[in-house]
């Protein structure tokens, strides 16, 4: 016996709701706790290190500058290619015996402070100092409390242990090694964010109008896979409970935010590769379910007879052939993405699955009125702010940012967001938005669309166009805040909630309809509606 379609959709929605409890934000590379003293107040720069071995151009490494020393040029054409020499002693903690005149000094980390190494290399005539870290990460090189004044006039930067070992090996083999150091800047605005904005707004719009656009005719209603079926009672006509929907209650909204916070803390303390793998499997199941429902719905809208042929299978019983074929297709796509999820192009499949899952969730989970919407969105509003800005005071770092970065062992993160490559950024990376930043406002906007439709409101007197504008504006303000704050993590709901819920409340007050929005679906039907009198 197979599970009912709604049960499958409800399970997928539940998995998705746990995923959206984790809202991803950006992070920066500034250390605001490091002491600021004369000569030690630089911002950390990411550096491209191009190398040549015996005249042959090799792999380009990534490095990071120190909080002291001179800044590197951002333009490659202004950088100068210089030879590299190992320091003697290799740790650069005492006077150097090697000749470094107009050369880049290559040293190793340890035994003394970064500032001591920099001063020793500069005294030895080095044009720059490259430190080899003792691990595959780039640590921030800051000044110590005893460094009351520094006068380091050469660039100081750090490379990973694997990059440093490759350079050191070539030098020890008496090969000529040359480096070109420059620090290209990321653009203030990456135009790829426009596509992310369109994907987010488009997802909310499609999810809102989906039931209306794909509403089946009476003779083919049985083949509808995604659009919820209206019940015949009075509450259904008033936006109340429907057969295949899950109405979120006020208590449920509070419990969800508390559960999401608990889950976030568990991820923070127990983040591991197997934990991420389990959540990725949940994501794949939810995305596959959403893709299946969307495709079946679209096909049966165009060809109502396509879903009429059934096939009797063991354990499953009567199954639509169309549904089975689409399910197999979605399963193959899901497996292909899962196997290639760590490749550079995996973002496209992740976005497709994410959008399908969110559209599916917004058809199942619904807000009954503005009262519940206010409770849910206000809780999510403070939840987002707390875990981004206040949690560092308790956990020594932002829990939200730490979870968003994923596992340090594998570098893999939870696929809980839409992302698109930063096309104009020399450092690559991704523009991202968390599922919660789409689904939380999306729940409100979907309710508003139903309210407008059931009350015969148009563009001029409706709420839906205003909320779509508000959501788009909120996203714009989110990215504007991100760029103004130089990439510092921004809780998106800080902007999205006022631009959606705030607009709803203001319009409701102006139009004197706030009471109707607040109590929508809770009014008791009149006796005449329940027991209509017979006609005379």
Curated annotation (Swiss-Prot):
GO terms, molecular function: aspartic endopeptidase activity, intramembrane cleaving
Pfam family, one: Peptidase_A22B
Subcellular localization(s) per the UniProt record: Endosome membrane
PTM annotation: Glycosylated.
Record flagged with keyword Protease: yes
Signal peptide from the UniProt entry: 1-29
Active site (catalytic residues): 384, 437
Transmembrane intervals: 187-207, 244-264, 274-296, 319-339, 345-365, 375-395, 429-449, 464-484, 490-510
Lumenal topology ranges: 30-186, 265-273, 340-344, 396-428, 485-489
Domains (record comment): The PAL motif is required for normal active site conformation.
Name of the molecule in the record: Signal peptide peptidase-like 5
Organism of derivation: Arabidopsis thaliana
């Amino acid at each position: 016996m197979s599970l009912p379609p709604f049960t499958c959709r409800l399970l997928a929605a539940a998995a998705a709701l746990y995923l959206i409890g984790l809202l991803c934000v950006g992070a920066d590379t500034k250390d605001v706790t490091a002491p600021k003293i004369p000569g030690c107040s630089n911002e950390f720069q990411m550096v491209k290190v191009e190398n040549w071995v015996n005249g042959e151009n090799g792999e380009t490494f990534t490095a990071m500058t120190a909080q002291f020393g001179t800044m590197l040029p951002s333009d490659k054409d202004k950088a100068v290619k210089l030879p590299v020499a190992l320091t003697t002693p290799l740790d650069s903690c005492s006077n150097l015996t090697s000749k470094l005149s107009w050369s880049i000094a290559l040293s190793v980390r340890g035994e003394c402070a970064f500032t001591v190494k920099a001063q020793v290399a500069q005294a030895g005539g080095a044009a720059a100092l490259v430190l080899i870290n003792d691990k595959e990460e780039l640590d921030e090189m800051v000044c110590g409390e005893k460094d009351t004044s520094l006068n380091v006039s050469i660039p100081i930067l750090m490379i990973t242990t694997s990059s440093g070992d490759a350079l050191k090996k070539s030098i020890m083999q008496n090969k000529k090694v040359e480096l070109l150091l420059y620090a290209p800047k990321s653009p203030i605005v990456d135009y790829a964010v426009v596509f992310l904005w369109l994907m987010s707004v488009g997802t909310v719009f499609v999810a809102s109008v989906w039931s209306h656009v794909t509403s089946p005719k009476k003779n083919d209603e049985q083949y509808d896979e995604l659009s919820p079926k209206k019940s015949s009672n009075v509450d259904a006509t008033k936006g109340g409970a429907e057969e295949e929907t899950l109405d979120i209650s006020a208590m449920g909204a509070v419990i969800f935010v508390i559960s999401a916070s608990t889950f976030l803390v568990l991820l923070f303390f127990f983040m591991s590769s197997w934990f991420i793998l389990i959540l990725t499997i949940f994501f794949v199941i939810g995305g596959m379910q959403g893709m299946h429902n969307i495709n079946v719905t679209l096909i049966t809208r165009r060809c109502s007879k396509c879903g009429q042929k059934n096939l009797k299978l063991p354990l499953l019983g009567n199954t639509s052939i169309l549904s089975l074929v689409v399910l197999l297709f979605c399963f193959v796509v899901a497996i292909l993405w899962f196997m290639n999820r760590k490749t550079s192009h995996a973002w496209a499949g992740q976005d497709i699955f994410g959008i399908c899952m969110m559209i599916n969730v917004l058809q199942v989970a619904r807000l009954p009125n503005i009262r519940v919407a206010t409770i849910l969105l206000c809780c999510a509003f403070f939840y987002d702010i707390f875990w981004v800005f206040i949690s560092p005071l308790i956990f020594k770092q932002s829990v939200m940012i730490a979870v968003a970065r994923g596992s340090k062992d594998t570098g893999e993160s939870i696929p809980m967001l839409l992302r698109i490559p930063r096309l104009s950024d020399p450092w690559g990376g991704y523009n991202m938005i968390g599922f919660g930043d789409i689904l939380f406002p999306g729940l409100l906007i979907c309710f508003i669309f139903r309210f407008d439709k059931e009350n015969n409101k148009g563009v001029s007197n409706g709420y839906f166009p205003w909320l779509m504008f508000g959501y788009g504006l909120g996203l714009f303000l989110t990215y504007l805040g991100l760029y103004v704050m130089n990439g510092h993590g921004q809780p998106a709901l800080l902007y999205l909630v006022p631009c959606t819920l705030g607009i709803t409340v203001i319009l409701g007050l102006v139009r004197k309809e706030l009471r109707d929005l607040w109590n929508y679906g809770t009014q008791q039907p009149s006796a005449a509606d329940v027991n209509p009198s017979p006609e005379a």
